[in-house]
Each structure stands twice: as C-alpha cells, then as structure tokens.
Amino acid sequence: MYLILSLIIFLAYVAFHKKRTNGMPPGPFPLPIIGNLHQLGKSPYKSLKSFSDKYGGLTTIFLGSVPTVLISEPNILREIIIKNNDSIIDRYISDSGLIIGGERNLLFSKGSFWIKYRKIFSSAMTNARKFNIASRIEQQAISLNNYFGTYANSKQAINPHDYIRRYSLNGVIDYSFSDSVEYESDTHHIVIRAAEIMEEILATGNPHDYLPFLKPFYTKKRNTLAMAVGQVWDYCNDAITVHRKTLDHEKPRDLLDLILMEIEKSEEKQFYDDDSLSKCLTDLIVAGHETVAITLGWMILFLSNHQDVQQKVYDELINVVGKGNLPALVHRKDTSYLNACIQETMRIRTAAPLALPRIASEDIKVGGYTIPKGTQVMMSVYGMASDERYWKDPHIFNPERWLSSNHSTENGGGGGGVVGNSSQSEVFIPFGVGPRMCVGMGVAKDELYYCASQMFMNFKWSPVNDKPIDDEGVARIALEYKEYQVVLERRK
C-alpha cells in the first residue's frame, strides 16, 4: 500500500515538474523541496560547470524551489544580457540581499533607484581620474610594500593574506573617504572588522536564501549579518555628514566629495538621501575590495610557483620603469607581460565564479527555449573561463595566452588565448557584462596594477623551502586560496 502511494506521489511530482519546466532548457532532475542543492557538493562552481558540460550552454536547475537558468556560452550570454537587457537587468534578491541593502543599494536594487544611483557613482568615478584621486591608491601600495620590506632578506616566512586584504580595504576607504589603517597596527578599524564579519557569513552561503523555512534556524547568523552591515552604514553616514560640512568644490579629496558634487548638480537631487547613499557606499567597501584581495593572493601564489614568469615580470618592469623609479599607471600600457599575468590570474582563479544573479522580468526566448518570467538567471564566469572550447589548456597558468602582436592587454584585450570563434572579451568577464557590470572596475584594475607592479619590482617571492604552494581553491561564494607562506627577498 505504502509502495503504491509512494509511486503515485512520485509520478505526480514528475508530471508537475515536467509541466513547470515545459519549454525551459534541459537540466538535472530536482528533488522536492531542496531541488538540486544536494548536487552542488563542496565545490558548487565545479558542479555547475559539470551541469553545463552535460546539458549545454543553457541549463535549468532548481535551488530549493527557485527555478534557475545557468548561462555558460558566450553567444547565448550576449543574446540574453545585451539584446534582452531590459528583460534581465534586475537582480534576484535573496533574504541575505535584503539584509545587506533592503533594495536600496547598488548590488541589490531595481528600476529607477538603481539607474539613478549608478549614474551618480559612475560619473563620480569618471571625474576621479581628472582630480587624480587614484594617487591615494598608489600611496597605499607604497605603504604595503614598505611593510613587506621589513621582512625582506630575513628568511622569515610570512603569510601575506592579512596584509593584502588590509591593502585592498585601505584602498577602498582611502579612495572613497580619505581614511585608512596602518599596516602594522593591531587595532581593527570598525569598518574593516565589520566587513570581515560580513564576508565570513556570506562566504559559505546561506541555505535559508533558497529554503525560507530554515530562517528560524539561522536567526543568530542573520542578526549578526544585520549588525555588521549596520556598523558599515553608520560609518558611511558619519562620513557623509563630515564630507558635506567640509566639501571644497575646487579641491575634492576623494570619491565621496565627487559623489556629493554630482548630487548637487542633479536636477533630481531631492531623490538622493543619506541612508540610501550610505548603503551604496557599503557596496564599495564590502564587494569592492574582494576581487582585489583575492586576485593579489592568487597572483603571489602563482608567480611564486612559476619563478620563470616572475622573472619575466621583473625584467619587464626594470626595462619600462627603470631601477630606482616607482611604477605608475602611465607605465601600464608598456607592461604587457605584467598585465597578462594579472588577467591570467583572474581567468584561472576568478574571484567570483558566478556573477550575482539576475531575474527575468518577462518571458525570454533564446536558443529555442523559454526562460519564464520570475526565473533566476546566473552567469557561469568560471565555466566560460575554463572551457576547453574557448581556451587551450585552460587549467594551466599561462600568461602568454594573452599576448599578441596585434592586441594590447592593458584594458582586457589580447587575442592569443582563445580558440574557436569567441573573443576574449566574450569569455573573460571577471567584472560582469552589460549595464550591470561592476561600477568599480576601473578602481579595482588600478589597485591591482599599483600593488602588483610594486610587489614584483621590489621583491622576489618564493615558496618556503622551494616546495610548490597548493593552488587548489577553497570552494566558497568567492574562489579563495588556501592561506600559505612565502619568503621575500629584496631585488637588488
């Protein structure tokens, strides 16, 4: 009797699933309630790539009861994100997303709010170059490398993790607010500690985002996240108050000054309020530094393991910059090999294996399939960056793939590594694609270049006892490295 009843229930569920996915892309069969969550394993980004390998560039999965379409093919991505932009521009907002921004920040907002605030931030960041605000990042890179210098030639192994994270956070809060923390200080700046708490909570994922009935079991975790977010909001609100009182329109100090100036010029300045502005600034602090910190950590690891590559970077910097001189952004166009190393690091160990999800605001027809309104849509950044159809030997660290006599690597170009008909700009999207592309991309690239150029011009980085460092990533929301130790030697 129970067997027959179970069979009837199972067949009814199969029929229900077939009906609700009619016309959608293929994918693995989901279980009731949990969907395909049980199949993601310890390395979700790898599991999702295996789904794409099996089912194609458009794959349907269920995260809990949330229907999700995974994109892992560039021509499909281009058609969906670019050609159907108005139908796919909004974010899918989870419970954690609501806690972080309440739909009034840059990462997790929709409609006119997102459009207007992004425009203000984008304009301010463009103007930041006119006022040389990036010089603040340069000074942070100098401070970090001066600190590394205290370890050089001591033969003392160090773990660079905490220092590069402090650099990336310092870069953001100095660039944005004219604030920073000394590298040798044991004191945790309140915003740095709050950001660390947020990252710790978000890094491992939150099951209640897709299984809402679990919320009561995650009350403490959700409250801790809300408290940490609130501390950063308060910090940003205080900074807004101080900056507004001390603003000099002729001599803007940082990004926040420029944002306030943009708001003053706006015909809709009444639309912008301090609480929403503080939430948007929080995005820069928390999300803005993550890519930089993780990429620099991976870059030190790979160049320590590949001494021949590191030597080529050093030789290029000496040739372009000259001994005794300081690398600067003006040198970037002439340091193609260093640029290639940065890009190869971001490809082989992309900090964000999955771009933040979007939601279809209406039915989308693509590739003979339908993505129904309300479906969560994810882009597999890792999947495209490691697909053998587009990259030769994708799991090998090879900066040479980015070099071409006909292309520059300065801004993400290069033509040497992609096979088939896709260009690198289509299969290499560490900062996203389309209007939702990371608004702080330019700042992140500057942070990476300033720090990497100084690190590899001033020091030789080596594994402890010349034993190769483990380059397997830690599977979290971001693709992080396992913490490691290296030995520094000052270049002569």
Swiss-Prot record:
Quote one Gene Ontology molecular function term. Answer: oxidoreductase activity, acting on paired donors, with incorporation or reduction of molecular oxygen, reduced flavin or flavoprotein as one donor, and incorporation of one atom of oxygen
| UniProt xrefs under Pfam families | p450
Report the SS bond pairs: none
- Enzyme Commission designation: 1.14.-.-
Tell me which Gene Ontology terms the entry assigns under biological process.
Answer: organic acid metabolic process; xenobiotic metabolic process
Q: What are the subcellular locations of this protein?
A: Membrane
GO cellular component entries: cytoplasm; intracellular membrane-bounded organelle; membrane
Q: Does the keyword Transmembrane helix apply?
A: yes
Membrane topology, record value:
Single-pass membrane protein
Out of the domains of life, which is the source? Answer: Eukaryota
Q: Does the keyword rRNA-binding apply?
A: no
Please give the cofactor(s) recorded in the UniProt entry for this protein: heme
Q: Which InterPro entries match?
A: Cyt_P450, Cyt_P450_CS, Cyt_P450_E_grp-I, Cyt_P450_sf
Key words of the record: Heme, Iron, Membrane, Metal-binding, Monooxygenase, Oxidoreductase, Transmembrane, Transmembrane helix
Q: Which residues cross the membrane?
A: 1-17
Q: Which PANTHER family match?
A: CYTOCHROME P450 307A1-RELATED, HEME-BINDING MONOOXYGENASE FAMILY
Q: Could you say which protein family the record assigns here? A: Belongs to the cytochrome P450 family.
Q: What's this protein's name?
A: Probable cytochrome P450 516B1
What is the phylogenetic placement of the source species in the record?
Answer: Eukaryota, Amoebozoa, Evosea, Eumycetozoa, Dictyostelia
